[in-house]
Amino acid sequence: MLRASADYSVGMTDTASDAYSIPQESIDLRDMIRQISEEQIAPRAHDIDASAEYPWDIRKLLAENDILGLPFDTEYGGTGTGALMLNIAIEQIAMSCASSSLILMVQDLGTLPIRLFGSDEQKARFLPSCASGEKSPAFALSEPEAGSDPGAMRTTAKLDGDEWVINGSKNWITNAGVADFYVVMASTDRENRRIGAFIVEADREGVSIGKLEKKMGIKGSPTGSPVFDEVRIPKENVIGDPEKGLSVALGV
């Protein structure tokens, strides 16, 4: 089982060789993931891309080997081994299958808003199941008219009593259709260009998937358009201040 056992930070030192050295634990991890990738992921790469189907078996494989826990601290069931080891893992998987590497990349990106800006309750509620690989997230920012410009987005969130009501759609979202929840950026005050960040579970009424993109490559990682039609979420699903979501988007 992968767990932090040393300082994995790479700091500035007196020599260039030391500055770019990699800890032995990271080398061991690299070799372990390289073996898994070459022996079990690479043989599936062609079929994954040819079928354009999400590789659930690879996600299970990564979870069973603690690889999906790399982005997370130990208190949430992760490895606590830091960004260096995460990026080494992504690199090794991508060498065998780019689609499969995005499983780990999105596990990191989709939970980053919660890890950086979420409440303790939100972290406890959403992070352990992602660290174990039981659930997978998606980060929903880009829109057809706005691209990835948070200030121009048209998806809205309106407060109605104790709930927020989300309306709109997103484009080019990695993990669309397979994610268990979306971190959705939505306008809370269009006139003043205020936005918020909201955790929207995929099984909530009003959540659907519109278009799935037909891509030239990396076809096993779905890219699509989640649609939110009068989707109601509790106040507890707001990440931080509902009018300061721009800092969340830019921080990620």
Question: What is each stretch, according to the model?
Answer:
Residues I33-Q40, G118-R125, G161-N167, A197-V207, ...:
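Long, well-ordered alpha-helical segments
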Residues G147-D149, W164:
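Hydrophobic, small-residue-rich alpha-helical packing segments that form membrane-like cores
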Residues E64-E134, T174-F181:
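Internal helix-loop-helix
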Residues M1, D7-Y8, M12:
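Short, positively charged and aromatic/hydrophobic N-terminal segments
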Residues E163, N167-I209:
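A short core secondary-structure module
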